[in-house]
Amino acid sequence: SYLVKGDDGTLGIVGDAFSEIAKMSGIRITEVNLPRKRLRKMMAKGKLDAIFSAIEWEDDVSRYVWTNGIILVSDNIVMRADSNLRVRQTADLKGKSIVVRADYKYPSLDPLITNGEVTSHKANKFENLLRMVERKHVDLGIIDQNVAKWIIRKEGLKFSAPLRFVSPGFDEVQYRVILLSKKWLPQVDAFNEALAKLKHSERWQEILNQYR
């Protein structure tokens, strides 16, 4: 099976969990990293068996089958620690400039961006997003804080001013494996059973600790 693996912490957790379950089940998989535009083209051509995603982010999910959620993710507001802005929820973003990831969906923010109530800039990489916040190119950034902290640790990033994340996050979704053909439906129950066993094992905590 071919399945897309990204380079951020959240996808790393999902990818490692999937690989672990595949080993337990004797399934061979090939994981590939793809830019989002190329990913969509390969999906349309039927060249992928599965992707890591959230069903809330995919169009016409009735065409697919999917596993139980592997990990819960959300968007957090990030700002410089010395910022005087008081922002606790998405409504507080009106009139602000923010940076988001290119090609990502933000259900709570997209209407504000479309209406011009929020000025948005797009970053192609998580590090670029964090740097734009650090350098005051924008007021705020939007990123899952667990992913951000993993990127900072993995890349050894240093900032001229500390960054602060606002909790709780918003637009919570479950990352899962989305199978792009219904031929996989018979395997989903077995996958979910193996996933439940993994989450009750020491190995699951080891996977999480690698990224947090």
Pin down the residues of each PLM region:
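Hydrophobic/proline-rich hinge and linker segments of small-molecule sensing/allosteric domains
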Residues: 67-88, 102, 179-181
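Ligand-binding cleft/hinge of the Venus flytrap
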Residues: 16-27, 68-69, 90-94, 102-125, ...
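Hydrophobic residues within well-ordered alpha-helices
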Residues: 21, 43-44, 77, 93, ...
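Extended ligand-binding regions for polar small-molecule ligands
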Residues: 12-24, 84, 91-96, 103, ...
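A ligand-binding cleft/hinge motif common to bilobed small-molecule-binding domains
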Residues: 41, 53-63, 139-171
